[in-house]
Amino acid sequence: MIASLIRSRRRSRRCVVYSVFLFGFLALWGSFALALVFLSDMYIGEDQISTQKAIKPIARSNYHVVVGHYNGNLPEDKKRNLTSEELNANLYAPHDDWGEGGAGVSHLTPEQQKLADSTFAVNQFNLLVSDGISVRRSLPEIRKPSCRNMTYPDNLPTTSVIIVYHNEAYSTLLRTVWSVIDRSPKELLKEIILVDDFSDREFLRYPTLDTTLKPLPTDIKIIRSKERVGLIRARMMGAQEAQGDVLTFLDSHCECTKGWLEPLLTRIKLNRKAVPCPVIDIINDNTFQYQKGIEMFRGGFNWNLQFRWYGMPTAMAKQHLLDPTGPIESPTMAGGLFSINRNYFEELGEYDPGMDIWGGENLEMSFRIWQCGGRVEILPCSHVGHVFRKSSPHDFPGKSSGKVLNTNLLRVAEVWMDDWKHYFYKIAPQAHRMRSSIDVSERVELRKKLNCKSFKWYLQNVFQDHFLPTPLDRFGRMTSSSNSSVCLAWTLRSSGIKTASTADCLKIFHKTQLWLYTGDRRIRTDEHLCLSVVQLLHTTSDWKIQLKECAGFDTEYWDFKPKIGRFQNRKTGLCLASPDIFDPTKDEFNPPIVQKCRSSNDRQNWTITEMSWLPEHP
């Protein structure tokens, strides 16, 4: 009996410890989203062909980079010193130990470093290092133990893996192909379809590449476009030739890890309208170190309709802790890596054929999937690495990148965003000016045919933590009563961090001076940011304004007294004020402050000048 009592007390203590841990975790989640990485299993095991290597989780600050393909024109100064011989050279010559186990290569000789620097612009990554790493290099076991122990149903659907490339490096393209072959069950891999978007590198042309791929132990098809068509149309070319039950799209500079495919196909077997994406791990563009990605972020978008990664809402994070292998609902997908039932892809309307080259197709497909009865998900048990480049080596043939992107995003807004398209046009007037020349009637008819839901439904049910204006919000500029020409603003520092500031009010509709005072009493702006306060020292008075990702902390909530225009922070009881001295010529950003509320201090009084983003109706 005594032993039983001791065991009972031990269990009780464990429960208390766990409860305290869970409470503390949830309290810190919003500000420290990266802490979730450490709660994931950080043990890096070995797959069947690798040596164990330590891999650091990728930093959140590096994770806003979009999985991209055709991001803009290669500057002339980068093209100038690249000879035809350099562009067409295939210098693949692997070293025995380079990159094994996902390790990075950083210790180059002076001669190697000089060559690496001179050829970096060819593909906007370290070509010398990539060419020195085996196309069948080993990778560590990335998955957490609960994922490794999972079993999957029999008779999973087969997949066609579609990889589009344009002037891709030989080593990264072959490494992508081999990783698919080596780490996919043979019975599930129907074929690999390579779509050449009019490459002009000799080693990618017929018959050189065809001869290289012919001995590989899987069915590989190469489709070559006779002109440059861009990612969107090239993917549709591949989809039209596919024979697998499922289409799996990958970029041409990826590495699949062990167990990457089964979770994707299982999810589609269970729900044919699910569109699952793997967790995207990071392959460093300089060292090619394989770094584990963050499993607790999901896709969103900012006011410019640019894809972004944002932390899960607290309630979702809490739920995910209870089932860390379960799918994560994502409002949008990055677009480079995902699987979709082939018949469902066709029923849903494939890609929008009116979109050109690259840009916005991931948002268009995400909105369409969600609004028309499907779901976009990220699967924590599926990991695929991707080389994240800081810029693109490719161009938009015969067109400016701005015009292509604005045209594509206009199509997204016109077809899927209903009233909120007008808000996008306010933020991107250059897109609005093209509106009369773009015909989206066929896609509008598709939306009607599929009986799709409204964008309001999408915001209320899918992207509930969005930061677009709604009728419940007060939206516009916040001006200081002490100086009506001074506006609350945010400023992008050289470090890439956005900070709260005050600035001369602009006469134009500019997102850096636009704020939402929401129905739940938060002051929000673009990029999922909230005006908050942070305590610098452990005193009751030393508080500072902070612009941070919204997380639902009580430091983010402000009670507004409209008669006097005062914002009082709920956590501290302090009032928002413009700086003591406003000097727009200073290098500093004239940050707002919080201080003890005083009725005589007009710097604590603010006026919300509401701005209309909807068109006026007669």
UniProtKB/Swiss-Prot annotation:
Please give one Gene Ontology molecular function term for this protein: carbohydrate binding
The entry's localization annotation reads: Golgi apparatus membrane
Protein name, UniProt field:
Probable N-acetylgalactosaminyltransferase 6
Q: Which organism is it from?
A: Caenorhabditis elegans
Name the needed cofactors.
Mn(2+)
The record describes the protein's role as: Probable glycopeptide transferase involved in O-linked oligosaccharide biosynthesis. Glycopeptide transferases catalyze the transfer of an N-acetyl-D-galactosamine residue to an already glycosylated peptide. In contrast to other members of the family, it does not act as a peptide transferase that transfers GalNAc onto serine or threonine residue on peptides that have been tested. Some peptide transferase activity is however not excluded, considering that its appropriate peptide substrate may remain unidentified.
* Lineage of the organism: Eukaryota, Metazoa, Ecdysozoa, Nematoda, Chromadorea
Q: In which pathway does it act?
A: Protein modification; protein glycosylation
Q: What intrachain disulfides are recorded?
A: C147-C381, C372-C452, C487-C505, C530-C550, C575-C597
